[in-house]
Every structure is written in structure tokens, then in C-alpha cells.
Curated annotation (Swiss-Prot):
One of its GO terms (molecular function) is 3-beta-hydroxysteroid 3-dehydrogenase (NADP+) activity. Disruption phenotype: Death at embryonic day 10.5. Embryonic lethality is caused by severe brain malformation and heart defect. Most abundant in ovaries of pregnant animals. Present also in nonpregnant animals in ovaries, mammary gland liver, kidney and testis. Substrate binds at S171. NAD(+) binds at T8, G9, A10, S11, S12, G13, I14, G15. This is 3-keto-steroid reductase/17-beta-hydroxysteroid dehydrogenase 7. Its EC number is 1.1.1.270, 1.1.1.210, 1.1.1.62. Binds to the short form of prolactin receptor.
Length: 334
């Protein structure tokens, strides 16, 4: 029986690279591309099938920044499949990034230059917005939409006799200082992306505590510093092109400078081959590239309090109840 792999954000960047790499290793997979843009998804499917004709590739339209779209897409997935072996929670946004050029140049000549390059801490803020669901856009897109997707797909994911895996695309930018249980959506702060990624790490721990006994395991990874549409929103592409030689040189000291989506997907592919029971839920697995261009995976212990993770999970469940009620009322106005 073909293994079924569902990937959100599969039409570009790391998600697209992941699709190609998985099929290159096992073209007997059934990939399901969960994408917002159907035309782009169809183009990706055609390209993948042209190079891997024995594979199966299907498409589900899904916008993780819309609860209605997630629920509708999940229903379509449940009609197509009886189980999911892997769910890659990869879609995400970094909207309206504000780059602090002064802090960047100061950082280059400081002892924190490596930390700055790998986390963007201190040089990057974002202007968030509110979705039609009344939630902060970064929070809903990067975390809550995926949480609802997991909840909707539980019947396909929870099989104690044959474990399924959740694999989240997180970030080194995930910082405890940018997250608060009193403001889980980071509506009052300047770094919603960092907050959403730390929330991802928390949820990963809570999901393992609550679902391992049901045969569902969760892991988080960091792709490193990758050139994608997301990073092109921070600086123009030509600036990144000028920075490439510096980044290649720095790889001898900073293995997080993976640069290409192919390299950035290394940990995603590595996790695909691991027995989920053997993985540490408190470890973030990071894609790394050596100065000589060799890809490998490193493990980093996360700064996570398990009780906080459980409290966050409970807050998400309460938010789910509230938001579902609101959406149902909008679907059926009196």
C-alpha cells in the first residue's frame, strides 16, 4: 500500500523542494499537495509527475489562514484517503517585514554576528493584520490553521498499530521572550513570526504528550537560512545575490546557512526516514550545510517548559470552540 504524505505550502520554496526530494527517494508515494493557489498546485503536480511518472500526486485547495478553507479541505482529504502516514505542516508567512539596517550593520561587527545571521533576532520585525476569522494573520497561518487541520484529520492520523507523523517547519527565530500565554496571538508585539514559531514548538510537545498513545507523533525542524519568497520580502533578490559569497564563506563557521530550498529540506527528509518513537519531542531537528556543501541534520534542545506547553494546548482548545462557533454563525446567518 502506498504511503500517503500531505504537505501544506507545497507549491513553492521548501515545500516544493520537499516534494521533489521525497519522490526522488520513493516514487511509490502518494503526495497530496495542500495549496491555496490551484493553478500553481496543478503546475507543480504536472512537473512532479513528468519526472516521477509512477508516483501519485493529488491536490487539495486549502488556505490555512481561513478556518472555513481548512475544514473544507480536510473534508476533501477524508474523502480521498483512509489514513495519512505523514502530515507536513509547512505553510507559513512572514508579512510586511521591517528590516533594521542600522542594527544589521552594527551586528556584523559584533560578537553576536553568527546569532544574528541564524535567527534575525534584533533586526527584523513585522506588521501583522487580522483575518476574516478575527485572528491575527501570522498566528492563524503559521499555527492555528494547522492545529485545526490536525483536529479535523485525527481519524486519519491516529492508528496505534501503525504510527503517523506530524512534521512542523519551525525556526531558530522561535524565542521564548516573544511568546506569552496572555497574548498567544502576539497582537500587542512586534515579532509575531517569532511568537508563532515558539508556539509551534510548544504545541509539538503538547501533541506528543496527548497523542503518542494513540499512534500519532510530532516533530519540529528548522530549515536554516534559505532563499525563498519569504526572505525576498526582507531584502530584494539582488541584495541576497550580493550576499551569497559571504554566506558561502560563513558556512565554514555557521552551518545554518543552507541557502537553497533543497538544502533547507534536509531535516524534513531525514525525519521522513526516522521511527517517530525514537525521536525526542524536546529536540528541534535542523537542516545544516557544511562549508564544503555537505548536507546533514543537527539536534537542538528546545527551551520549552512542558507545563506551559500543556496550558497552551488547553488555551488552543478553548479558542477552537470559540472560533468554530463564530464561523458556524457566519455560515448560517439568521
Amino acid at each position: 500500500m502506498r504511503k500517503v504524505v500531505l504537505i501544506t505550502g507545497a507549491s513553492s520554496g521548501i515545500g516544493l523542494a520537499l516534494c521533489g526530494r521525497l519522490l526522488a527517494e520513493d516514487d511509490d508515494l502518494h503526495l497530496c499537495l495542500a495549496c491555496r493557489n490551484l493553478s500553481k498546485a496543478r503546475a507543480v503536480r504536472d512537473t512532479l509527475l513528468a519526472s516521477h511518472p509512477s508516483a501519485e500526486v493529488s491536490i487539495v485547495q486549502m488556505d490555512v489562514s481561513s478556518l472555513q478553507s481548512v475544514v473544507r479541505g480536510a473534508e476533501e482529504v477524508k474523502q480521498k484517503f483512509q489514513r495519512l502516514d505523514y502530515l507536513y505542516l509547512n505553510a507559513g508567512i512572514l508579512p510586511n517585514p521591517q528590516f533594521n539596517l542600522k542594527a544589521f550593520f552594527c551586528g556584523i561587527f559584533s560578537r553576536n554576528v553568527i546569532h544574528m545571521f541564524t535567527t534575525a533576532e534584533g533586526i527584523l520585525t513585522q506588521n501583522d493584520s487580522v483575518t476574516a476569522d478575527g485572528l491575527q494573520e501570522v498566528f492563524e497561518t503559521n499555527l492555528f490553521g494547522h492545529f485545526i487541520l490536525i483536529r479535523e484529520l485525527e481519524p486519519l492520523l491516529c492508528h496505534a498499530d501503525n504510527p503517523s507523523q506530524l512534521i512542523w517547519t519551525s525556526s531558530r527565530n522561535a524565542k521564548k521572550a516573544n511568546f506569552s500565554l496572555e497574548d498567544i496571538q502576539h497582537s500587542k508585539g512586534p515579532e509575531p513570526y517569532s511568537s508563532s514559531k515558539y508556539a509551534t514548538d510548544l504545541l509539538n510537545v503538547a501533541l506528543n504528550r496527548n497523542f503518542n498513545q494513540k499512534g500519532l507523533y510530532s516533530s519540529v525542524m528548522c530549515p536554516g537560512v534559505v532563499m525563498t519568497n519569504m526572505t525576498y520580502g526582507i531584502l530584494p533578490p539582488f541584495i541576497w545575490t550580493l550576499l551569497l559569497p559571504i554566506m558561502w564563506l560563513l558556512r565554514f563557521f555557521v552551518n545554518a546557512l543552507t541557502v537553497t530550498p533543497y538544502n533547507g529540506a534536509e531535516a524534513l527528509v531525514w525525519l521522513f526516514h526516522q521511527k517517530p518513537e525514537s525521536l525526542n519531542p524536546l529536540t528541534k531537528y535542523a537542516s545544516a550545510t557544511s562549508g564544503f556543501g555537505t548536507n546533514y541534520v543537527t539536534g537542538q534542545k528546545m527551551d520549552i517548559d512542558e507545563d506551559t506547553a500543556e496550558k497552551f494546548y488547553e488555551v488552543l482548545l478553548e479558542l477552537e470552540k470559540r472560533v468554530r462557533t463564530t464561523v458556524q454563525k457566519s455560515d448560517h446567518p439568521s
